[in-house]
A protein has these predicted regions:
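Bacterial N-terminal signal peptides that target proteins for export
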Residues: 1-13
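C-terminal motif of bacterial Sec signal peptides marking the signal peptidase cleavage site
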Residues: 17-20
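Ser/Thr-rich, low-complexity intrinsically disordered terminal regions
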Residues: 22-143
Length: 143
């Protein structure tokens, strides 16, 4: 009986899942590498702090492997055509030792298809500014 109920719910959920995934386009993936003048553990803590401050949803947190993948979702009231409607997908890899680390990042923006066609520069600028703020927390400027 339970199996039949489970099979009946799948067709009902499938259209909802497909509707949630359509209508989006992704920008190009951009990668970078930066030295961090701190230990690998400190770089990890700084990266998590920066992502939390930027309201990213953390998907994968692997402190032993030094991996973080995250997505910043738009707010429910974001208007298409504004930077608030852009999603930012980010993957970080932190490698190193107690005396220094390397921060590798890979990111892209994701936006509604109509916005990706007409105003891709808005999302690209938002992605760049967001990554610059994260970079400033992980690798603070020298005083």
């Amino acid at each position: 009986m339970r199996r039949a109920a489970a099979l009946l719910s799948v067709p009902c959920l499938l259209p909802m899942l497909l509707a949630a995934c359509t209508g989006l386009s992704a920008g190009p993936e951009v990668s970078s590498m930066a030295p961090v003048p701190a230990s690998r553990d400190s770089a990890w803590v700084r990266a998590k702090r920066a992502l939390t401050a930027e309201t990213f949803t953390l998907d994968v947190q692997d402190s032993l492997g030094g991996r973080i993948t995250a997505m910043r979702y738009p707010s429910a009231t974001a208007k298409v055509g504004t930077a608030a409607a852009c999603r930012v997908q980010l993957a970080l890899a932190i490698q190193g030792t107690w005396d220094g680390a390397q921060l590798a990042s890979s990111s892209r923006w994701i936006a509604p298809a109509e916005m990706a066609q007409s105003k891709p520069d808005v999302c690209e600028k938002d992605r760049q500014e967001t990554l610059a703020r994260i970079q400033e927390v992980v690798v603070p400027p020298a005083k």
